From Swiss-Prot:
This is Nucleoside diphosphate kinase. ATP binds at K11, F59, R87, T93, R104, N114. CDD domains: NDPk_I. Keywords: ATP-binding, Cytoplasm, Kinase, Magnesium, Metal-binding, Nucleotide metabolism, Nucleotide-binding, Phosphoprotein, Transferase. It comes from Clostridium perfringens (strain 13 / Type A).
Amino acid sequence: MRLEKSLVLIKPDAVERNLIGKILEVYEGAGLKIKAMEMKQINKEFAEKHYEEHRDKQFFNSLIKYITRSPLVALILEGEDAINKIRSLNGATNPEKAEFGTIRRRFALSGTENSVHASDSIESAEKEIKLWFPKVFYEEICG
């Protein structure tokens, strides 16, 4: 297996409830390495760019309002099969359908306030890392 990188967001609901450490503990306990991490307060335009594939969905405006309401933590995690591993640790988007022990089952408040986001493919990871961490992306690609 090869090393993969994934963007992960610890969303506002989790930050507001002081869950950053508990969530990071899950990822690190699974052998994932933090390659970059930053607390950010994003604006509407940035959020719309990140969630552009959801623009036509009915939940789009409430999602943008939620993700911009207070700071979040953006990080790049790296590990073997990182994308699948992280998605498994996170659990289903809807916390009621997430498996017991997953981050969303343990901490999420709702389908929108679901505590974490993670890239769902290598392609989305590259796109999201480039958006959230352009300097890191540039250094990785251009050396």
